[in-house]
C-alpha cells in the first residue's frame, strides 16, 4: 500500500466515523443508580481527580485515540490538543504506524505534543509493531503512556488487513518489558473478557481500555470500504462497555481499567466509574464537536460535561471516584443474565 493510499484510508476512517451514530439501545441504560434524596455534600466538594498506578489525571475523562497520518488529521489532532490543553483533559492520538513508516507523517501526531507540551498524552501502536518501533512511538510524543490497540475483527473485515495474530500476545509482553511508560491494551469497539484480562496480567500488563461495542464501529467502517460490502452481519460483534467492565470485576485490583465505547453522556461516565473504571474515553463526540463547532464550542462542551459529572456525583453523595464506587445500583434482566451465565461476582453497593 502506498503512502497516498494510507493517507486516504485515514481520512476515510474519520469521515465514516463522523457519519456514524451511537446504537439506539445502550447497555448503559440497563444500569440504574438508586437515588438518595438528601445528599450530605455540595457540588464544590466533588473531586474528579483520577489516580492510576503511574499518573494522576485532573479529570476522569480523556480524548481517546482517533486519528493522525494525513494533513487533514494533523489539523484535527492540533485542534483536539488545544482543547486538551485548555481543559486539562488527557488525550490519545490514533495509530502512529504512518509516522513510523514515513517520517514525513510524524508531525501529524507530534503536533499534539507541540500544542500541549505539559499535558498527558498517550501514543498508539498496533499489537504487531516491532518493539523498537513501540519505543519510537513513545518518543515521538514524549508520551506518558502507550496504547496498544487490539483490533482483530477490524483487520479481518479490512480488505487489506492483517490475517496473522498468533504472535500478538508475546509481542505485547516484549513491549511491556521494553518501554519505560505504562502500556494500555486498548480494544477498538469489541470489548474485553475476563479470560483476556487474565492473559494480559500474566504477561505483565497493568492497564486496559475495554472499548466495548456501542460507539465507533470499525466492522461497519471497514465493510463500507469493501467492494461488495458483504460482512455487515458482524456489525454487532463483541461485548458492550458495560459487559466488559462487569467482566473486569475480579481483576480491578490488578488492572487500571479505563472504559470507552459508546459513552454518550456524563451519566454514562459516572456509571463507568461506579463499575470500576478509573477513567473514561470518548472519541466521536469530541471529533464531531471540534470539526462541526470549532475549538471554543468544544471547550465549552467539555466544561459543561465536567460540571454535569460533578452534579451527578453530588446526587450520589460521592465526593470522589473511590466513594462513587460504593454507590448502589441495579441491573436489568439482560445484564443479570450475562452476569449469571458468565459467573461474575459483582459488587452493587
From Swiss-Prot:
Entry keyword set: Cytoplasm, Flavoprotein, FMN, Isomerase, Isoprene biosynthesis, Magnesium, Metal-binding, NADP
Cofactors: FMN; NADPH; Mg(2+)
UniProt-listed CDD domains: IDI-2_FMN
One GO cellular component term: cytoplasm
Main location: cytoplasm
Binding site for FMN: 65-67, 95, 124, 186, 211, 216, 262-264, 283-284
Pfam families linked to this entry: FMN_dh (PF01070)
Positions contributing to substrate binding: 9-10, 95-97, 154
InterPro entries: Aldolase_TIM (IPR013785), FMN-dep_DH (IPR000262), IPdP_isomerase (IPR011179)
EC number: 5.3.3.2
Molecular function, one GO term: NADPH binding
GO BP field: isoprenoid biosynthetic process
Residue sites binding Mg(2+) per the record: 155
Keyword Isomerase: yes
Cell location: Cytoplasm
Catalytically driven reaction(s): isopentenyl diphosphate = dimethylallyl diphosphate
Similarity comment: Belongs to the IPP isomerase type 2 family.
Oligomer status and interactors: Homooctamer. Dimer of tetramers.
Function recorded in the entry: Involved in the biosynthesis of isoprenoids. Catalyzes the 1,3-allylic rearrangement of the homoallylic substrate isopentenyl (IPP) to its allylic isomer, dimethylallyl diphosphate (DMAPP).
Record-given protein name: Isopentenyl-diphosphate delta-isomerase
Species of provenance: Staphylococcus haemolyticus (strain JCSC1435)
Lineage: Bacteria, Bacillati, Bacillota, Bacilli, Bacillales
GN (gene name): fni
Amino acid at each position: 500500500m502506498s503512502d497516498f493510499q494510507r493517507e486516504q484510508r485515514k481520512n476515510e476512517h474519520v469521515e465514516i466515523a463522523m457519519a456514524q451514530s451511537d446504537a439506539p439501545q445502550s447497555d448503559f441504560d440497563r444500569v440504574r443508580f438508586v437515588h438518595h434524596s438528601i445528599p450530605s455534600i455540595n457540588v464544590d466538594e466533588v473531586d474528579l481527580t483520577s489516580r492510576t498506578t503511574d499518573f494522576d489525571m485532573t479529570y476522569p475523562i480523556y480524548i481517546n485515540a482517533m486519528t493522525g497520518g494525513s494533513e487533514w488529521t494533523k489539523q484535527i489532532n492540533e485542534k483536539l490538543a488545544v482543547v486538551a490543553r485548555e481543559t486539562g483533559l488527557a488525550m490519545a492520538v490514533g495509530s502512529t504506524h504512518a509516522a513510523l513508516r514515513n517520517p514525513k507523517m510524524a508531525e501529524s501526531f507530534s503536533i499534539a505534543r507541540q500544542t500541549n507540551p505539559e499535558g498527558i498524552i498517550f501514543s498508539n501502536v498496533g499489537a504487531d509493531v516491532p518493539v523498537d518501533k513501540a519505543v519510537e512511538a513513545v518518543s515521538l510524543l514524549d508520551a506518558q503512556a502507550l496504547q496498544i490497540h487490539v483490533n482483530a475483527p477490524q483487520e479481518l473485515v479490512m480488505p487489506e488487513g492483517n490475517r496473522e495474530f498468533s504472535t500478538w500476545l508475546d509481542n505485547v509482553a516484549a513491549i511491556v518489558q521494553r518501554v519505560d511508560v505504562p502500556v494500555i491494551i486498548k480494544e477498538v469497539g469489541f470489548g474485553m473478557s475476563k479470560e483476556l484480562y487474565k492473559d494480559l496480567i500474566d504477561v505483565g500488563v497493568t492497564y486496559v481500555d475495554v472499548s466495548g461495542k456501542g460507539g465507533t464501529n470499525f466492522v461497519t467502517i471497514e465493510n463500507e470500504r469493501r467492494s461488495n460490502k458483504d460482512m455487515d452481519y458482524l456489525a454487532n460483534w463483541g461485548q458492550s462497555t458495560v459487559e466488559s467492565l462487569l467482566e473486569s470485576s475480579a481483576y480491578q485490583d490488578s488492572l487500571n481499567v479505563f472504559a470507552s465505547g459508546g459513552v454518550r453522556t456524563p451519566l454514562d461516565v459516572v456509571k463507568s466509574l461506579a463499575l470500576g473504571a478509573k477513567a473514561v474515553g470518548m472519541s466521536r463526540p469530541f471529533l464531531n464537536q471540534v470539526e462541526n463547532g470549532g475549538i471554543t464550542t468544544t471547550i465549552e462542551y467539555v466544561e459543561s460535561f465536567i460540571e454535569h459529572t460533578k452534579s451527578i456525583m453530588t446526587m450520589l453523595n460521592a465526593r470522589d471516584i473511590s466513594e462513587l464506587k460504593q454507590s448502589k445500583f441495579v441491573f436489568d434482566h439482560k445484564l443479570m443474565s450475562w452476569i449469571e451465565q458468565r459467573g461474575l461476582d459483582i459488587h452493587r453497593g
